[in-house]
From Swiss-Prot:
One of its GO terms (biological process) is dUMP biosynthetic process. This is Deoxyuridine 5'-triphosphate nucleotidohydrolase. The keyword Cell inner membrane does not apply. Pathway: Pyrimidine metabolism; dUMP biosynthesis; dUMP from dCTP (dUTP route): step 2/2.
Amino acid sequence: MKVQVKLLDPRLGKEWPLPSYATAGSAGLDLRACLDEAIEIEPGQTVLVKTGMAIYIHDVNFAGLILPRSGLGHKHGIVLGNLVGLIDSDYQGELMVSVWNRGQTTFRLEPGERLAQYVLVPVVQAEFEQVEEFEETLRGAGGFGHTGKQ
């Protein structure tokens, strides 16, 4: 599938690699911090970081997700401030990453550092049918923890 990409930072593709799939089985493309200088993110602090690119999906059957990189989250407590970024198919602006330091120490984010990943996913838009009652199921309305440990 092809999507349109605008490079908004001239360092992408020159100083820093363009996003690409690391392996044939990779689901995500790494997004980089397009910063002019390193920033220090204090514990509990959230900052908005530019990626230097805009992606226009165009196809209403797809959306983009911005997800945290597992190593940054596990090793440094660096995750997304909004947990998951949802990019609609008709959005054409720059991809931004809300970076949250949930760790205990200050984290230094360097220019060009990989900070999140972008995944393209299929979308199904639901058509709601209003009903008075649902068809009965074994689970019913059982919610959080309903099935217990198994």
